[in-house]
Amino acid sequence: MFSVIVIYFKKIQIHSYQEIIDGALNYLKTKVPDVYNRTHNTTYYPLDFKKLLEYCPKLESAFDEYSIKCNMAVAYIMYNNTHSTIHIDKFHHDARINIPLLNCIGTKTIFFSGGEYEIVQNPLTKTNAKRLKSLNGIKVVTQVEIDDTTVIRVNEPHTVIMNAEQSPRITLSLGFDKDPVFLLAD
């Protein structure tokens, strides 16, 4: 019998890393302060990608060496650990690429197997996800600190634990013209 090895994450290098971080934070603070300040009761905020590109023009070419083009961005913002639960993103690709923007050192993205899930809808953004309904069979598989550009498998159960002494914790979660899951292969 074969056993399948699932790779949940992989750190990669991109061009203009710091410029993208600086531009994205500037965009969040000046153009969508309600998102930065998390005035809405949601953690997952799809961003206006064209407006974000005005602040992060290098985002268009940052992934050229991987032959993928970024075409969507989400700000994932937490002010405390109740803002993330074990969930599975309901996304048309198996992976996204996350860039740490603020206070990600000392935080963990934890991946799980098992559990029972139900589909829930974000009331603000109308996006769907699967949220843990039952701990039946749940166990930790692995974890990663998003301290650099990281491909993560969003179609597997995961959650984020932040350093409660440093908030907000913000990552930029990126989608592409083709699924970046191929970057998780050895």
What kind of feature is each model-predicted range?
Residues M1-I68, A75:
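Non-heme Fe(II)/2-oxoglutarate
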Residues A24, K51-S61, S67, M78-T82, ...:
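Short amphipathic alpha-helical surface micro-motifs
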Residues I68-T149:
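Catalytic core of non-heme Fe(II) oxygenases with the double-stranded beta-helix
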Residues N122-D186:
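Catalytic core of Fe(II)/2-oxoglutarate
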Residues Y8, P100, V151-R153:
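Short, well-ordered beta-strand micro-motif
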